[in-house]
Structures are given as structure tokens and as C-alpha cells.
């Protein structure tokens, strides 16, 4: 009897197997109805040059692109933004940070720009504090990171990752980075309104006047790798009508059938741009009238630097002459190019994944300067109208410095130390102690518990940093891995690195603020 049933089972299995194959019909590529993603354009929006002239020169279009790189990118670029505020124009209320017209951001770089613009809208315009004063005095009330950890091992458990958390990433971003506490509207330390694309993009027919820079988060279409710039006309053109956020229920974007793009929450753009496959859930949107979804992943898959969207924004700015279109690229790639040789050992899966992802990013970085210059020439913008700030800014400066005995001692200690975080903590402790001894406690700000905040070293002391100081700062910061969760020590070193790198470019950055007649 068992044999009989087993035989019947095998026959049914074979039949279903054959049927399954017979149902896999040929898909005709000639019948694919491809709808392209709307391109970057400023045609339907009021110009950012209409903002208050006290704070920005309407004759210069200044854009900043911030690359991806997880929390390393977030806090290094945050340090750069803090440093940009310290570059003031002569006889003016303007500074480089206020002059910025456009932000093009990718992945971790979205967090710093999103945080700054949220604070600019809700706090700085209402008070008389600088961004530096607010950031370092309100750090306890205003978190600027998502308390979520991830590792490369999550790549091996993608099914669990795709189910998402009880609280979606977009909700966490709103609460912890964009400061919108929808669960507790009486919270005095949080913003009462959600950041929407309408905060940055004002339609031409509106009676409102632009007062914020434009911020564009960049994502990548999962199915074909095409770049998606989160702008109102792009959202509307894609017929998005819902967000399939990775939680228990579909979260509608608004009450309309199709979102008009202006009421699109910024948090969705940032979430999509930072959705690194296998580490954070893919961001999925419902499309009106189609039994399909739009799945968006990390913007770094299509352009990890954000330069393409930024140059398209500058090119589309019809109010400013091409010779006065300027750009700053914040490059948050920490490690340098790896040597091609490895030890003769069995190649591990995790090492293979790491090397493959690094190669994908670095093949683009290898031609970065040439790509930028080619794009500038194509758009008829002078190739002298851009600067790059990154960890290489610190390294290049370090190479020119005079090396003394203390530098050689630190170099030897670094070379002989294991790449273990406990050792990095020891280097951090000594570095902090040496700076306080060297410059005095009054050169720093303290937190609410009276602890010195290392990242607040006053910028007029930067010229006095020694080669040994900068060596530790550079090596510590550039060794921070691309990850979500970050330690307080890593945060401090990244912020200080960003501020110092910006200071080292002061002359070049001031030239970008000079109007070409």
C-alpha cells in the first residue's frame, strides 16, 4: 500500500513539475511598456534665489552634494556643515552654510542635511542661535541618529530584514532625526509639523516665498538601477498613492488618490535613499491603477556621491549665469584603495561580500574628478567652480606637515596595535587628554553633565594642531566602518574631522562665494 501511494505521489509531483514549467511563458521584450522616471527639473518651482538677500547672494547658485557611507557619512558631513557656518563673508551676515541653495544627498548623507534643514525651519529662524550653538547645546533633547544596529550578517538573513520592525524606519527617522513626535504632540522639544517636500519646493503659482534651500534625496529603482530624485514632479509622475512601509499596515501618503508630490514626507525619501539591500528594508510604494509596486533601494547603487542630481539642479537654475554656478562635494568614503594582494588563505564569504561592495563603490570614485569635469563642461560651467572635502583633505594636509618625534611615536604605536575597538578607545582617550592639555578647557564646550565635548574645539585653534594630533584624528575617523549604530567617541571624532577638513579649505571655499563678474 505504501508503495502504491508513493508511486501516485511521484506521478503527481512529476505532473505538477512539468505543468509548472509549461506555465512559464515567454515574456516578449518587444511588448515592454517602459515609462521613464521624470528627470530633474526646476521648471514648475519658484526659484530659491527669491530667498532673503540678507542670507544669500541671488547671483550665485551654490549646491552641496553629500555622499553615502552610513553613520560615518552622517557625522563627518554634519561636521562639515558645522564648519561651513564658520566661514563668514566679509561685511555681511552671510556665511557659506546660509548661502547653500541646493542639497543633493545619498544614503547616510541625507541624515545630516535633513537634520540641519529641520532645525533651520523650526528653530534657527525663530531664535538667534547659530547652528553650532544649537547643535552642541541641544544634543540631549534633539537626537540626530537612529538607534538601530545592523551588520553584514544581516545580509545572510534578508527574509527577517524584509519583514521590518514594529516601528518602521520612516517613523523612526521622523521621530529621531527629523524631530517630528507624532505620538506626543505636547512634547516641547519636538517639532509639531512633519517635514514635507513642500517645505523645499514652492510651486510658481503659490503666494508663498521660498525660505529654505532645496533638498533632494536620491534613491535607486530596484528593478533597473535607475536614479530617482525625490522631487514633487517626480513623485507625481510616478503615480505613487501609498507607501508599503515595512510594518503591519499600509501607510497612506495623504487623502488623495495620487500624491501630488508636495505633500510627500521627507522621511520617505531619506528612508528609500538609505535602504542598503539586506541591511535596511527596501522602500516600497503603491502605484495607482497597477498591480505593481515601485521598490527603491540605496541611492548609492546609482550614484553614491549625489553629483549627478546636483549638477542637473544647477543647470536647471535659470536665474543665475553659468559662470556663477558653484558646487561643493562632501566625500565620506573613509578607507583608501585596497592593495590587490591577499594572504594565501581560504576566501571567506563575508570578506568576499565586503570586497565586492567596496569595488562597486570605488570603480565610480576612481573616475569621480573626471566625471565631474566632463559634466561641468557639458553644462558650460567653469571647471574651477567646485571643491571636494573629504577624509583625503586631512590626509593631503598631513602629508605636507613637518613630522616630529611625537608623530613618529604615534605612527609606531598605530602600526603595532591590533585593529580592535578597545585599542581605538585608548588612542581616543589619549588624544582627548592631549588636546585639553594643549589648548585648555576653555577652548571646548561642556555638555549638561559637565563633560568636555571634544568636537567643539574652537576653530581658531585648528592651525595649532600638530601632525601627531591630525594623524590620530585622521586614522580614527577614516577607520569608522559604514554602519548604522555609532559610538559617542566615533561621533566626536567624525564631527571634529569634518570641521577641521572644512577649515583647511577656507580659502578655496571663500573663492566659491565670490561672484564672477
PLM region spans:
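Bacterial N-terminal signal peptides that target proteins for export
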Residues: 1-9
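Bacterial N-terminal signal peptides
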Residues: 9-20
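Catalytic domains of lipid- and phosphate-ester/thioester hydrolases
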Residues: 21-517
Amino acid at each position: 500500500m505504501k508503495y502504491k501511494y508513493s508511486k501516485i505521489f511521484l506521478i503527481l509531483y512529476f505532473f505538477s513539475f512539468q505543468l509548472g514549467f509549461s506555465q512559464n511563458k515567454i515574456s516578449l521584450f518587444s511588448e515592454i511598456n517602459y515609462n521613464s522616471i521624470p528627470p530633474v527639473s526646476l521648471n514648475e518651482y519658484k526659484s530659491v534665489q527669491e530667498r532673503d538677500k540678507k542670507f544669500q547672494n541671488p547671483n550665485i547658485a551654490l549646491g552641496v552634494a553629500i555622499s553615502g557611507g552610513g553613520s560615518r557619512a552622517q557625522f563627518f558631513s554634519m561636521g562639515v556643515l558645522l564648519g561651513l557656518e564658520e566661514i563668514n563673508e566679509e561685511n555681511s551676515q552671510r556665511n557659506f552654510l546660509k548661502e547653500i541653495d541646493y542639497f543633493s544627498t545619498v544614503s547616510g548623507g541625507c541624515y545630516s542635511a535633513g537634520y540641519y534643514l529641520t532645525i533651520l525651519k523650526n528653530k534657527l529662524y525663530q531664535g538667534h542661535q547659530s547652528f553650532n550653538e544649537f547643535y552642541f547645546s541641544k544634543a540631549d533633547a534633539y537626537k540626530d541618529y537612529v538607534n538601530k544596529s545592523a551588520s553584514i550578517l544581516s545580509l545572510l538573513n534578508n527574509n527577517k530584514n524584509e519583514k521590518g520592525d514594529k516601528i518602521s524606519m520612516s517613523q523612526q527617522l521622523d521621530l529621531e532625526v527629523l524631530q517630528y513626535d507624532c505620538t506626543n504632540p505636547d512634547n516641547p522639544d519636538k517639532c509639531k509639523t512633519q517635514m514635507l517636500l513642500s517645505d523645499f519646493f514652492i510651486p510658481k503659482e503659490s503666494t508663498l516665498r521660498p525660505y529654505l534651500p532645496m533638498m533632494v534625496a536620491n534613491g535607486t529603482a530596484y528593478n533597473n538601477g535607475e536614479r530617482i530624485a525625490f522631487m514633487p514632479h517626480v513623485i507625481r509622475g510616478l503615480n505613487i498613492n501609498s507607501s508599503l512601509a515595512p510594518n503591519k499596515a499600509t501607510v497612506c501618503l495623504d487623502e488623495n488618490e495620487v500624491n501630488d508630490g508636495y505633500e510627500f514626507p521627507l522621511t520617505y525619501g531619506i528612508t528609500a535613499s538609505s535602504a542598503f539591500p539586506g541591511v535596511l528594508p527596501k522602500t516600497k510604494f503603491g502605484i495607482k491603477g497597477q498591480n505593481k509596486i515601485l521598490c527603491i533601494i540605496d541611492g548609492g547603487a546609482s550614484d553614491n556621491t549625489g553629483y549627478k542630481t546636483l549638477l542637473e539642479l544647477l543647470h536647471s537654475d535659470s536665474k543665475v549665469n553659468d559662470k556663477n554656478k558653484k558646487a561643493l562635494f562632501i566625500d565620506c568614503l573613509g578607507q583608501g584603495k585596497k592593495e590587490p594582494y591577499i594572504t594565501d588563505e581560504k576566501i571567506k564569504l563575508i570578506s568576499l561580500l565586503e570586497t565586492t561592495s567596496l569595488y562597486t563603490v570605488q570603480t565610480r570614485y576612481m573616475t569621480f574628478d573626471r566625471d565631474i569635469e566632463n559634466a561641468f563642461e557639458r553644462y558650460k560651467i567653469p571647471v574651477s567652480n567646485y571643491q571636494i572635502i573629504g577624509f583625503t583633505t586631512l590626509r593631503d594636509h598631513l602629508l605636507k606637515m613637518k613630522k616630529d618625534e611625537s608623530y613618529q611615536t604615534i605612527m609606531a604605536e598605530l602600526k603595532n596595535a591590533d585593529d580592535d575597538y578597545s585599542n581605538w578607545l585608548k588612542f581616543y582617550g589619549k588624544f582627548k587628554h592631549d588636546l585639553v592639555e594643549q589648548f585648555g578647557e576653555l577652548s571646548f564646550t561642556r555638555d549638561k553633565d559637565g563633560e568636555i565635548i571634544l568636537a567643539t574645539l574652537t576653530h581658531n585653534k585648528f592651525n595649532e594642531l600638530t601632525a601627531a594630533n591630525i594623524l590620530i584624528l585622521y586614522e580614527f575617523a577614516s577607520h569608522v566602518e559604514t554602519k548604522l549604530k555609532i559610538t559617542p567617541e566615533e561621533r566626536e571624532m567624525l564631527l571634529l574631522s569634518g570641521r577641521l577638513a572644512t577649515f583647511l579649505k577656507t580659502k578655496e571655499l571663500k573663492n566659491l562665494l565670490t561672484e564672477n563678474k
